[in-house]
């Protein structure tokens, strides 16, 4: 897949051997890398009036063509900008980034999409401003041109405490990420950053029945946008994720209801796990084909630097688990985009359990082993409640980071993050979304057959009988967990997680695989000295690696890999 990097500054002063120079003007150069599988959604135009760059997928491109009565993307952008000069791109849906320059006024803007599945990274120094859709490429541009680049200790702290970047920080201190829903504007020679879109919590006055009806209509529209993109490019066979959860199967169920019948599912997990069993049952129930990737042996654990480079150090390196290795083996001549159910659990649900305007950053942390550094603001975007804070940090900046890895093979899509769908859901009263209350009502009303497919997501018990059974099952599971933890503490079990049967039993692997322990220990010992100039970060990495919890060690190694890969 392709990426772009552009710099505003003196022409011919800077070089970039990893990209092909596509556009050059008085003070702007644009380079392109890779290859594009979706050319009709790609724009790289330079004429006497404008410079236009768009990368990604515009899922509602044909809708906009009909609205503006054109069938040319460049012409569409010009007409949209005439109507909305500052934020025409807010009407786009999908994973996109872009750049627009009006040559006679010397005005420019750079933008990213609303939901974090695409990104723009920015570097500014003196008369030079560099923007790129790929953080690794930007790091190499800085290195090749010997431009100042300092290790980002704040990004390291976020990685070691949250497991992902909760703000615009990157592992290069001089580079910041343009956050979801934001754009950069050049006016009178000065750049400014503006939010053009932000989801809002609301209390929309609508009954649950009306809400369910609108949810179904908007979700079907979102699924259609995603799957029609495959058909636009002649891909008759759709590639769709399938897990043990509810979200991926609802994408598949609704897609089938809309007539998309040629679906191949992809799934990956530990052999013999509940994840594998439930995912395969769902595939069989729906009559789809299946490409399954086993996580044993867990070879992706050793792809430390490769995965860190691919996800730009935005998330702990193994967040995608075996997904990258499985995608690398798929022949994408037969498939278009990767259809996923990403963030479905918070679109019609929520990360929070109680309504509160207070923001608790610790609620989205992957680890509480280290204290948060009081020098850093944990809520720089001033989110007004936990619901939105969790959506943007844990959701858009955390979970969506795996899409940077996936983009090396194809674009990933999810109807749950469709802006129209998600915007409606977040305007509903929180009580509707809590405990997936509205989610289950939607499925029960419109897709009752989906409830016959076993899932790892538990329904909230409704009848007295269901509540009594649920109470007994939870008591049994709790007793088993406590018993296993006690045995582990006595040294009578090898792993603190009885989860060899879970999807990603990291602790089990670490406890039972000498090669994994050797790899972790050797990488840590060999690379800790890279942080000699950053003693506070080195101390935090040391503390995390010495933690008995495997996830803490993974977070520590991610920081060391970032120090290696981006410098």
List PLM regions with ranges.
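Cysteine-centered catalytic environments shared across enzyme families
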Residues: 1-242, 246-294, 557
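Short, flexible coil/linker elements and helix-boundary hinge sites characteristic
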Residues: 9, 19-22, 69-71, 145-146, ...
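ATP-dependent adenylate-handling active sites, centered on carboxylate activation for C-N bond formation
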Residues: 12, 106, 188, 198-453, ...
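Generic structural signal of hydrophobic/aromatic residues within well-ordered alpha-helices
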Residues: 64, 76-77, 138, 155-156, ...
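Short coil/turn segments at secondary-structure boundaries
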Residues: 89-92, 169-178, 230-235, 407-408, ...
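Short, motif-level signal for alpha-helix interfacial/capping segments enriched in acidic residues
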Residues: 94-95, 395-398, 492
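PAPS-dependent sulfotransferase catalytic core
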Residues: 355, 449-545
């Amino acid at each position: 897949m392709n990426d772009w990097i552009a710099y505003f500054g003196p022409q011919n002063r800077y070089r970039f051997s990893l990209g092909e120079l596509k556009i050059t003007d008085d003070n702007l150069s644009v380079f392109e890398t890779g290859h594009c599988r979706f050319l009709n959604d790609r724009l790289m135009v330079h004429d006497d009036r404008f410079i236009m760059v768009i990368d990604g997928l515009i899922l509602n491109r044909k809708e906009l063509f009909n609205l503006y009565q054109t069938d040319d993307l460049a012409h569409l952008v010009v007409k949209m900008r005439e109507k909305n000069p500052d934020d025409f791109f807010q009407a786009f849906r999908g994973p996109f980034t872009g750049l627009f320059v009006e040559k006679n006024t010397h005005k420019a803007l750079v933008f990213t999409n609303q939901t974090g599945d695409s990104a723009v990274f920015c570097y500014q120094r003196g008369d030079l401003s560099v923007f790129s859709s790929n953080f690794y490429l930007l790091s190499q541009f800085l290195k090749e041109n010997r431009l100042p680049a300092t290790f980002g200790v704040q990004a390291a702290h976020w990685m070691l405490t949250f497991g992902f970047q909760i703000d615009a920080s990157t592992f290069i201190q001089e580079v910041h990420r343009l956050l979801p829903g934001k754009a950069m504007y050049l006016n009178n020679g000065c750049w400014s950053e503006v939010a053009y879109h932000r989801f809002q919590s609301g209390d929309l006055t609508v009954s649950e029945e009306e809400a369910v009806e609108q949810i179904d209509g908007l979700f079907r529209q979102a699924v259609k946008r995603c799957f029609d993109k495959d058909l636009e490019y002649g891909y008759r066979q759709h590639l769709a994720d399938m897990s043990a959860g509810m979200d991926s199967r609802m994408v598949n169920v609704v897609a089938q209801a809309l007539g998309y019948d040629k679906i191949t599912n992809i799934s990956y997990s530990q052999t013999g796990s509940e994840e594998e069993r439930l995912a395969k049952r769902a595939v069989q129930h729906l009559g789809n084909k299946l490409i399954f990737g086993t996580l044993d042996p867990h070879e992706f654990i050793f792809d430390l630097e490769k995965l860190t480079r691919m996800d730009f150090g935005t998330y702990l390196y193994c967040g995608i688990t075996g997904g990258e290795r499985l995608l690398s083996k798929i022949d994408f001549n037969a498939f278009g985009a990767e259809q996923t159910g990403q963030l479905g659990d918070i679109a019609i649900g929520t990360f929070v359990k109680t309504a509160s305007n207070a923001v608790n950053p610790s609620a989205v942390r992957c680890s509480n082993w280290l204290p948060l550094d009081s020098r850093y603001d944990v809520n720089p975007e001033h989110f007004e409640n936990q619901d939105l804070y969790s959506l943007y940090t844990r959701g858009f900046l955390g979970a969506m980071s795996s899409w940077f890895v996936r983009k090396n093979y194809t674009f990933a899509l999810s109807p749950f993050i469709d802006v129209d769908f998600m915007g409606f859901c977040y305007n509903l009263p929180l009580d509707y979304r809590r405990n997936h209350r509205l989610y289950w009502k939607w499925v029960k009303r419109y897709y009752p057959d989906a409830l016959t497919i076993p899932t790892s997501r538990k329904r909230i018990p409704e009848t007295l009988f269901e509540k009594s059974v649920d109470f007994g099952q939870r008591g049994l599971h709790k007793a088993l967990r406590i018993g296993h933890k006690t045995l582990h503490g006595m040294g009578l079990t090898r792993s603190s997680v009885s989860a060899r049967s879970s999807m990603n039993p990291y602790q089990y692997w670490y406890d039972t695989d000498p090669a994994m322990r050797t790899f972790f220990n050797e990488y840590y010992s060999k690379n800790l000295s890279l942080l000699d100039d950053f003693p506070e970060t080195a101390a935090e990495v040391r503390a995390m690696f010495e933690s008995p919890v495997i996830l803490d060690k993974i977070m520590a190694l991610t920081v060391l890999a970032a120090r290696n890969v981006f410098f």
